[in-house]
Structures are given as C-alpha cells and as structure tokens.
From Swiss-Prot:
Phylogenetic lineage: Bacteria, Bacillati, Bacillota, Bacilli, Lactobacillales
Pfam families, sorted: DUF711 (PF05167)
UniProt protein name: UPF0210 protein STER_0157
InterPro entries from the UniProt entry: UPF0210
Organism listed in the record: Streptococcus thermophilus (strain ATCC BAA-491 / LMD-9)
HAMAP family per the UniProt record, alphabetical: UPF0210
Gene3D superfamilies reported in the protein's UniProt record: 3.20.70.20
Entry superkingdom: Bacteria
Annotated family: Belongs to the UPF0210 family.
Subunit structure as annotated in this protein's UniProt entry: Homodimer.
Amino acid sequence: MDIKQVTETIAMIEEQNFDVRTITMGISLLDCIDSDIDKAAEKVYNKIVSKAKNLVAVGDEIAAELGIPIVNKRVSVTPISIIGAATDATDYVPFARALDRAAKEIGINFIGGFSALVQKGYQKGDEILIDSIPRALAETDFVCSSVNIGSTKTGINMTAVRDMGRIIKEASEADPMGPGKLVVFANAVEDNPFMAGAFHGVGEADVVINVGVSGPGVVQRAVEKVPGESFDVLAETVKKTAFKITRVGQLVGQMASERLGVEFGIVDLSLAPTPAVGDSVARVLEAMGLEVVGTHGTTAALALLNDQVKKGGIMACNQVGGLSGAFIPVSEDEGMIAAVQSGHINLEKLEAMTAICSVGLDMIAIPADTPDTTIAAMIADEAAIGVINQKTTAVRIIPYGKEGDMLELGGLLGYAPVMKVNKASSADFIARGGQIPAPVHSFKN
C-alpha cells in the first residue's frame, strides 16, 4: 500500500465520516424451540448471550486496532413467529422481553428478528406475532420487528398488508417511537445486517457475522472532484470509491468472524447515511449536478449511484449480500430532511426513487390521523414495486402529529418533518384482502 492510499484512508475516516455502520451477528434459534413459552424464551436468552457475549468487545478491539469507527454491534435472530409456533401462547411479548434482556446483557445497540414471513399466507405463529408487535415494541428498548408480506415468487399477501396498516397505527399509539423499529418488506433478505429489518434466515448457518459499511461522505467528496465530467467518468469515480469502502468492510468482517470463532457471512454494500452534515446520500446526488434532491433527474442520479456502488463492491468482496444499495431514509439523512422542509421532495417522488434504491419509504413521518387503510395502501404500492422489479422494497413510516410538525427521534435516527399524505381514500381497495398473484416473469423453472 503506497503513502497516497494511506492518506486517502485517513481522510475518509477523519474528514468524510467513513465508518463501519454495523457488525451484526446472525444467530439461529431453531434449537430453542419448546412447547412451553417460558422455557423457550429462556433458551433464546441463553443462546444469544452465550454466542454474542464477546461481540461488543471484539468490535471495539478491531475499531481501535484499525482506527476505523464501528458504530453499532447488533444481533439478528430466526423469525420469532417460527419459534413461537410450537407453543400454545396467544401472545409473544415474552419472547420480545427475552430478546431485550439479552441485548442489554451483551451491550448491543439493537436486536432484530421479532419477525414473520407471510408472503403467501398465515401459519399458526404469524398472526400471534403480528398482533404482539405494538406491545413488544412499546415494552422493550432494543427489539426490532419486521414482516415480509410479498415476494416476486408468491405475489403480495393483501390480507397481511391490511393488517400491517392497522399494526403500524397501534404501534404508534402504544409508543410514538415504536414504528421506527418496524419494517414491512417485500422480498426480504435473510442476511441483512441493518436494522430494523434484520432477521436470521432459516437457510443460514447457525451463527454468522454480517457487516454493513457506510460512506456517503466519501462518495460525495469523490464526486465533487469531477465537476462537469461525463457520466462515464462519474460512474468510474463512484465505482472506485465503493471498492475502497467495501474492502474495509470485508477486512472488518473477516477479523470479527475469526476472533469470535463463527462464519463470515456477507458485506452489505448499502450506503447508509446519518443526520450528520457530510454523511448524506442526498448530498451525493446533488454533487452530481442536481440543485436539490427531488428535482427532475434525481431518480437517474440515484440509479447511477446504486449500480456503481454494487459494481465496485462486488469486486472488493467475495461475499456480498443484504440489501446492497443506497438508503434514502428521510429522518436519517440531513440532505433529505432539508429537501422535505423546502418542499422539493414529496412522498410520490420518494416512491419513484424506491424503484431504484436499496429499501423504500424509510423513516418517514406522516400525520397521526392518516387512516390505517391509507398506510396499508402505501405498503401495497411499495410491495408492488419490489415484486414486479424483483428487488427488496420496504416501508418504515411513523404516524405522528400533523403535517409540518417535526418528529425528534434522536441519535442515528435523526428527525423527520411530518409529510403531506394524499387524502383520497383507498379503504375499499384494501378491504378486499386475499392475494395479488405473482407476476408472470416470476416463473423461472
């Protein structure tokens, strides 16, 4: 490594907010299944604590050794609806409490996996888990929840979509911050290291380490160095920068897996912003030549960014996965917040951007009086984009206050202006229930 690369790396960390956003340990709970919910919850607690007891210490040790901040240490587990189905319990809050207790014991930031996979229908544990979500989120500090309601192979479970509109409203009434820890997915992935949507898929190894990196500031600085250049030059610049960022993630993941004695899973190539100035995906798009994110050309700029991040990242790492794209959460991105406040971006433009980006309508505050059927319809729209385009899409929206208010979430979650929502009703559409069939191009066999 020559001296130029060394100084580049130092600048990435000190000036451009580069960090490893998360080391997430995925833990299978299939061997914790028990017909007695209290015994099962205790087994869950014990397994998480035994497997992840050194996660925080190892993360801090690697950060100190490399001089690279590792912001979060997290755990994801097998979807709890699967574990709970063996019990006769009618409420899975005891599992949520066990997860929360384990998270506090080992000192992690979040624990994901209070989840259900219902893309083609409900099984015994699924409805119980979904109905438990509002209380589970209100009565815990670190538990995150997700529900997969559709996939390209199966279509969209519109009964589950309808139910999740209601659950998001109930979660916000139980705790205003609750919906910030709840994601509704189409095409959810099994190896996602990012919260709140992480869960440990049943096809994964018993314990794995997945890494998520963050480098919008680094990409922004690189883009600013090629003003007026052609898109060919711009694309190459983004790709090379993504390579450098991902290489660090690969190194951290390998070191963590070796020291913890578990398998290395994937590096998620997503660019994850924070509310800090200089750590914004929106500002990267503006550096490409847009006056404000949200104007015409925004979706094209995001497409270039997303694709080149993938291309650079794939070269840098032998195992990539997770969501792998650019995140555009409103509350967690200083540039997105500014664009909403200035009126340059609305829900409809955000929805268009989600056809390109890594997730979907993410960390968006909407008026508290928004009907649950309208929330369900937003979920249906996002799911349709994901299912038809064979990509992951998601909704993480927070009903709060009235249009124009400011929702303060604090920390990495930032703050969100309450956005305008179309007032026309979708109630009769959502009331139908049932399944939207899989698209014709899903039949690959």
